[in-house]
Amino acid sequence: MLNIGFGNYISPQRLLAIVSPDSAPIKRLILEAREHHHLIDATHGRRTRAVLVLDGEIIVLSALHPETLVARLSPPP
């Protein structure tokens, strides 16, 4: 399981991408996911720093930086 912050976890097998929320296409993706009830907000009211795209068109918002999530996903050396 991948800790995405604040005690929230996702299955790494379902993870397709970890992206920054700053670009316009990603913002549109978030809006569409919210409209279709495919959005999970795991930020606990904090600023969104990473958008996780899961299979099944599920979008997860995280307050952790993408680099932090990738480091947690990678096995230790």
From Swiss-Prot:
InterPro entries: RemA-like. Signal peptide: none annotated. It comes from the Bacteria. It holds the Pfam family RemA-like. Belongs to the RemA family. This is Putative regulatory protein tsl2331. It comes from Thermosynechococcus vestitus (strain NIES-2133 / IAM M-273 / BP-1).
